[in-house]
Amino acid sequence: MIELKGISQHFRGAGGTDVHALRDVDLSIDKGEIFGIIGRSGAGKSTLVRVINLLNRPTSGTVTVAGQSLTALNADGLRQARRKIGMIFQHFNLLSSRTVYDNVALPLELAGTPRERIREIVLPLLELVGLDAHKDRYPAQISGGQKQRVGIARALASQPDVLLSDEATSALDPETTRSILDLLRKINRELGLTIVLITHQMEVIKQVCDRVAVLDAGRVVELGRVIDVFLKPRHDVTRALIGEVISQELPPSVLARVESRLVAARERGGRDHLFRLAFTGAGVDQPVLAQAIRNYGLDFNILHGHIDEIQGQAFGSLAILASGESADIDNAMHFLREQGVVVEEINHVV
């Protein structure tokens, strides 16, 4: 659906220095998926989303949407192509002098759409976003979440194939954010719309996205299914972003107890191992730890744990201290991996 190949974007910065906002980005986004792009401030994510509809023309590379090369189009062709790409923003950009209905109708009016046809398009959209009862209200009379719903309906008015969302929930409280994400998921499901969602919040990615690309300094440093990225983050930036949602670090009080335990093990010539386990799907429901303990005669001390949900799928993370013979611990970890558990040794003491 969307193909970005070799995308680089350079700007002339203060003092005449070159700013490399994007560096050789390759992305392929499938039709009908919700694709997340996440990164810290300055990572290049907002530049990237504006490259998709060529609001920013890349310094190099090609942009293809629905089989059409946007970078090869002239001004008129690009204007037509953009009608199939809707966009919502962090700031709602509503006209205060127009009602909810009229704000949604605005792009259709500008395109010269007949009045009756506008009505046929706008009223179902207002019902879809839950604002049919507020169509005659003005922006000052509705909440921030409702304003964003107006922005979403307006972006859908041209009946696009792609919806770009640039930090659309960043200015909203957590409860309103969840309701907007639920709405985007509903739109994706009912309209078959491809959604590209830009955010700096991993919680947003966790709730709604099918796949995610992690940007750092203008480069894609990690790419994959959201559940896989949470299970096996490879890049430090990804780990840090996930850590804001699901703590990957042991609390200080737990660390102090672990250090005492490891020191005692060293003094008696024992061997304790510290592991982080991540599991999902059936692994959450099955007693795999109990089986490992029984099968290999080990002691597992659960130090820290967290269970959450990603796209309706259970996800768990545990930090455990394993005590026993080295060979038995190795065999137990092999057994857990065979059950689909992701095993990472944090530290060990001989």
Swiss-Prot record:
UniProt keyword Aminoacyl-tRNA synthetase present: no
Enzyme class: translocase
Protein's UniProt keywords contain Transmembrane: no
Keywords: Amino-acid transport, ATP-binding, Cell inner membrane, Cell membrane, Membrane, Nucleotide-binding, Translocase, Transport
Catalytic reactions on record: L-methionine(out) + ATP + H2O = L-methionine(in) + ADP + phosphate + H(+); D-methionine(out) + ATP + H2O = D-methionine(in) + ADP + phosphate + H(+)
InterPro entries to which the protein is assigned, alphabetical: AAA+_ATPase, ABC_transporter-like_ATP-bd, ABC_transporter-like_CS, ACT-like_dom_sf, MetN_ABC, MetN_ABC_transporter-like, NIL_domain, P-loop_NTPase
A GO CC term attached to the entry: plasma membrane
UniProt EC number: 7.4.2.11
Ranges of residues in domain ABC transporter: 2-242
Residues the record lists as binding ATP: 39-46
Membrane topology category: Peripheral membrane protein
GO molecular function: ABC-type D-methionine transporter activity; ATP binding; ATP hydrolysis activity
Localization per Swiss-Prot or TrEMBL: Cell inner membrane
Gene3D superfamilies registered for this protein in UniProt: 3.30.70.260, P-loop containing nucleotide triphosphate hydrolases (3.40.50.300)
Assembly information from the UniProt record: The complex is composed of two ATP-binding proteins (MetN), two transmembrane proteins (MetI) and a solute-binding protein (MetQ).
Known role: Part of the ABC transporter complex MetNIQ involved in methionine import. Responsible for energy coupling to the transport system.
Family note: Belongs to the ABC transporter superfamily. Methionine importer (TC 3.A.1.24) family.
Protein name in the entry: Methionine import ATP-binding protein MetN
Primary gene name: metN
